[in-house]
């Protein structure tokens, strides 16, 4: 295992979406990894991604439920679910992938890390598409 000379701090985005009257609040948690093994860092990343994925699925289900209302769909609710709550989670997932990829490449520059790269591309595309949808939705409100 390759040693890194300087202490590495990897920012894993642990998100807590608190449902308050203002529609939600996003908190970012930093995790210092200076005294952790590469496996512990990777495990933290995976746990964070799992939590974010669960939140993404829950919000996607809420969005599907809202859209199933047909003509009774509330555009404001769709905007709140998609643009206020879901976009920050998608951004956090992308940042997690970027941070993990950087960490893994610093540990072993010759490793391909194709799985992380594929996840990063997928999360970038989903975030971009969702942001574009939010711009269109906002113009309708």
Predicted regions span which residues?
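A generic structural signal for ordered secondary structure
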Residues: 14, 130-132
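Long, amphipathic, charge-rich alpha-helical segments that form helical bundles/coiled-coils
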Residues: 76-130
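Sec/Tat signal peptide C-region and signal peptidase I cleavage site
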Residues: 15-20
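Enrichment for repetitive, rod-forming helical segments
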Residues: 9-10, 62-63, 124
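Sec-dependent N-terminal signal peptides
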Residues: 4-13
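Immediate post-signal-peptide N-terminus of mature secreted/exported proteins
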Residues: 21-78, 135-141
